[in-house]
């Protein structure tokens, strides 16, 4: 302690002694100083002695360090200040220097703290006076240079020392003094030192503020931990929590653009600018409230101690931060500054708890301390809860009118913040000082001050910590001061100022953009883009702007933020869009001619423009990189690991991955402390922004339309739902939308249309004029639109205005009525025109104006002074619209008129001035506006950004590649295109992607249709870029693969030319051309023609140079890269590979279709990639193969056989490889794979290719049979196609292989082939149907029979087989997959083949049924017979009559009998299932116009019933009877009775040719219609005679050529019906009584009659073989009715002589008149038999009565009819019938006989008169005898009876 004092005393003593020793002090005017020094020395001496140390006390500490504070020496050094103060005030430089030096050391070592109150000025501390004294030493430029240096040193020490505290005005004074020294000093070293010192001071001031907040945050954090620990009683992690403040030191991203240019500064300076002092003066003397002094020194000491203890805790963290910030200049200061920063500041922390709000509007910073002493800091300032501190005052947004001072809502949470604020604000104001007029002088104070202030501001911003970046006070300061300053300096013509402004802007954009949304917009709109867009702006300005833009464009966050916050904001300008458009123009070199730039300048500007565009795209790529999948970092196959070389490629790929936004600006969104931004910004929802963007585009479109035609614009906006329909809505729109053309708005409002008037009224009513004077109101009204020219329009507007004005100001007494206001308004308009229009020469005087307005106030005058005031105001300022915010960019016309550089400069400066004004006005206007800023986080934004800007990008890159050979430009363009493709790919924006890829493809020069002249390096690079794109973005290229693969295809051709190799054309096409080539000398080689390189004659030199330039394309790297695209196809994802393959096939197709030279390059590649990709998952592979297979389909059918052969052979190899892999059950990949073989077989008619396909398939079967599964389908399909071929070798090979499969492969691999079992059978049936090879046909049917054996032997295999038809029950699968196909195909054979094969097929089909039918289910039979009955299907029968007839007589016949056999064999199963169908089928047969078939039908009916009747149920019998009934009814030939010859009917043989006699003879003859149809022999029923054409029709066709065909057809049909009727009668007879029974009976009856032995004993037939016994009486009656109906019809016909004659004449049935005798007799005979049989049947007693009744009626009717017969032959026919009748009657009992005999008696008597045959007579005799006996007329002689009985 003692040592410390000693040092201090030594300092003081030496300094005082030095001052006293100076000769100047001896002078009188320094007496006061001298005295003060002496007194001080004396006191020091006394004190030293008093405090000499006791012996033995150890020497504590180093003497130079400040003593440990205690009460005793707290203010010791301070009391010796007076001599120094006086010394400083002396004008002697030496004394001043000594004094300053001592003060500096005392402050530095902490001996002088100045904490005591200043005795001279109440409310101030001593330290303030000390600083003031130091600053006072600077007396302007004339101050001694040494003194200047000492002042700088002392002030730096004061500001940076941690032992003393200076705040507010004192800090400002210190800063200002250094600033002035920099400006005023002529000494370069002093200037440099002053500047460095300033930088360091600012660093310290701001760092202290940040540190204080940091400490406080830590303190809070500890508190929180402690409390948590207390609450939880659980261990809490001891890591420092990541408080938002820990990340406040930004990396210095923006380089110091303003490097200290000390060398340039001229030491000579003029007088210090007074205004500068004035500016800072008022900030002086701000007084710190006495509150802080009331706290006792003891409190401060303890506070300091506690804090310093705490500081130990954070030593580690705090240590480096100040070091980072403070750039030491004065070496000795470093040690002190590095010391604990916290200590000095901490003391005041408690004292200035919340040191007051800055009063609004006060320029001098008077701080009212409104804090209560000792208030804990946390109440005002809680860093860990930022929301508390950041609450945005509600006044903020409304405060735009009030431009000075921070908003009242914001408060400083600490005095250190206020210090920083004051310094910052002063610098802003300094930078705004205007420069003197004329060209800027680099040495002038104004300019140097401006530059320095901007440099310092830049430094502050670059090092800004979290508090500065988030505290509302600073944000407001930036808005209100810095941004306004920038708007002024941002258009400076001094490059250095301009450059600094840009750097500051960059920093703001980087760190503060979340708070400065509006300001950034103004800066971009009014400065950056304006300078880029104006043709007059200088190259330097453009260059600097574009340099800055390079930085902005390189930061992804900034780029996306600009789009989201401006282009998607309805009220903001489209900055991103404009930026891209402007850059694109610059990159295209547009507008540079007018500027008179040199070529070098133009090129460098173009490059920069391109660089910016590429940067923007890189940012977009970077921003969306998470969505990009690099195909080379993954493999879709996963079969082999990538090789070493590939790994290295992946690690350093030439891909876009290396493009980051390398020099990206540091963005607030990433800093934790940006809570302000997150709080203010809306959520980042891309969809929402897209909607906004769309709305904005609609609004912009609407405004454009409005500015051309208002009504159209409004209508458009209403249609789009962006504008309401009411007048109020539209009026509001006119008020709010500033982009509307004011003239058009005026025209719209003035229009006389009813709606327009309503809008105008609403528009005026939305103005509030209350409390405004009349002229102000009028100005306000006319601000928004330009008054229209027509008087009536103005009139309407003024009228409404006057009314509204009075409505708003009802209390006014000036105007008597609205009329007055209206007239006055009108007069004001006239006055403003008069006074301010250049056209009006004689201006109106005030008197004239007053006179003009006489008597307008309800015949009274308005006060003269009132009118006079109006006149004066208008004269001073005309009424005009407010200046529109948008600066109009000079039109084209002015651009061209710039004659010289000088004139351009002049114009530019004028524009700059205007621009600065606008920018400043706008900045001030928005300085209080709070606009939410969204920090973009979502990668989706890139999509709409790119969609918006892709065209200007493309234009720039295309033009660049097109017209510039500079390699940098080319590489930038290519890089840009790559990025653009990447973005379009990632977001699958197809149109844009395709456009860029096409552009690339175009610049490869490979696809041009005109000839290639020569390839430049840029074209080669383009090819490489294209290949790289294919490599890195393959997954996303979609349709763009087309362009790429087209180029690769052409590249191969180019390589061939480059290397001079003859292209490997397909031999087939080149063969013919070889000859022509050799002969002609001046013709180009083919390959050149192929590429379209040359026309007719050739310049060989040119070709040589082309070859050379193209040679580069076959460099190793290109070849490898191309190859890598194909080998790398395995890494493409599932969708991409499909696109790739699809387009590869398309290109291959183009190659092959080339008329001159088909090439197979791509086809070979297809084969290669098929090999590479075969290992993909089956799902992907099948999609790939769908495309490739289709391509092979087409190629395999190529008319060029060589191509087709290559295709088929490639297919074979691929298939072999594919089949080797085998296939699991239920998969179908082989089927898809082998399908092209089928297609080629189907479509290619070339025998060579067809043969080759069959051979390939045969080879596969032979070598891979074990692996084939679903592929069998295709194999059979191919053989199926081969089966119908006419080429024997093809059919033979195919059939051999099929046979091999069916006999051997099926045996071994049956389960694998089940799926294609049907196909196999189908294939065999196709062979069977090939009529050209009958042997094969028969063999094929044998193989089908063989297949049936497989089904029968292995039903289990079918049951277990599962496939697509999972809905088939397992037990039915045998049927569906096995039996059904076999039987179905056989039915097909039957339907399609010639007779012998058909018959064989039919036989086999029924053989299979008979052999295996026992295993069939009921419903199978149903399906089966559906097939079988197809044989009879009318639709399927042959068309031609003869064939049809043949078919019916052979196949149908055969089938019919076969069906009946099967039915009989499986009756139990089939009776339910099949009977109806069989009956239906039989019914069908009898309806056909085929006699044979009709006979067979009835025949089969008979067979079925006779064979199975015993097992029939009652129901079945009913059905049988009904069927018979139906047949009967259908086949009654009614038309025989109704037919009439048509009038023009050709007559029968003409009467002239025949005599009457002959005619009569013929007419007497009659022919039975049934005669031609031979009766069926009962013993051999089945072999019915085959009559194909009924003789009737034969007769007609031969004999009567004139007869009409329809008649023949009809007659033939009628004939068949007659036949069927007869057959049916026979059938019923056979069924009921068994075949041949009746015939036998007739024969017996005849024989008995001949012997005259008819027995009339009652005898019942019991030996019934027929079905009689199974039929019920009702059923029998039904049959009976049929028979009788048939009988009656025949009777009717036979009796109708006239009709028969007509038919005979028409040629029906030959030589004589037709009749139906057989039908007439046999039907009745059968009926009688049935009735008599029933009559004698004991079991049918119940029916006897009816039977008797029927018998009596039938018999009497028959006898009556017989009596009417005239023709002998007719009666003859009845012989058997009468015999039967009489015999039967004779055999009934007497009793019954009575009834019958009495009934018939008279009729029988009548019969006697006919000439009857002996047998009949014999029976009649018996009858009459019996009558005698029964009626007891006579007694029979015994002997006679006896004889009979024997």
UniProtKB/Swiss-Prot annotation:
Q: Which GO terms describe its molecular function?
A: guanyl-nucleotide exchange factor activity; myosin binding; protein kinase A regulatory subunit binding
- Renumbered to this chain, region (HUS) spans 554-574
Tell me where in or outside the cell this protein is found: Cytoplasm; Cytoplasm, Perinuclear region; Golgi apparatus; Golgi apparatus, trans-Golgi network
The segment(s) forming the SEC7 domain are 688-877
Q: Gene Ontology cellular component?
A: cytosol; Golgi membrane; nuclear matrix; nucleolus; nucleoplasm; perinuclear region of cytoplasm; small nuclear ribonucleoprotein complex; trans-Golgi network
What does the PTM comment of the record read?
Answer: Phosphorylated. In vitro phosphorylated by PKA reducing its GEF activity and dephosphorylated by phosphatase PP1.
Q: Where is this region: DCB?
A: 2-224
Q: Which residues carry this modification: Phosphoserine?
A: 52, 286, 289-290, 394, 407, 1076, 1563, 1566
Q: Which Pfam families match?
A: BIG2_C, DCB, Sec7, Sec7-like_HDS, Sec7-like_HUS
The record's Gene Ontology biological-process terms are: endomembrane system organization; Golgi organization; negative regulation of actin filament polymerization; negative regulation of GTPase activity; neuron projection development; positive regulation of phosphatidylinositol 3-kinase/protein kinase B signal transduction; positive regulation of wound healing; protein glycosylation
Q: Where is this region: Disordered?
A: 217-248, 264-302, 347-410, 631-684, 1571-1600
List the keywords (alphabetical): Cytoplasm, Golgi apparatus, Guanine-nucleotide releasing factor, Membrane, Nucleus, Phosphoprotein, Protein transport, Transport
Q: What does this protein do?
A: Promotes guanine-nucleotide exchange on ARF1 and ARF3. Promotes the activation of ARF1/ARF3 through replacement of GDP with GTP. Involved in vesicular trafficking. Required for the maintenance of Golgi structure; the function may be independent of its GEF activity. Required for the maturation of integrin beta-1 in the Golgi. Involved in the establishment and persistence of cell polarity during directed cell movement in wound healing. Proposed to act as A kinase-anchoring protein (AKAP) and may mediate crosstalk between Arf and PKA pathways.
Q: What is this protein called?
A: Brefeldin A-inhibited guanine nucleotide-exchange protein 1
Q: Which organism is it from?
A: Rattus norvegicus
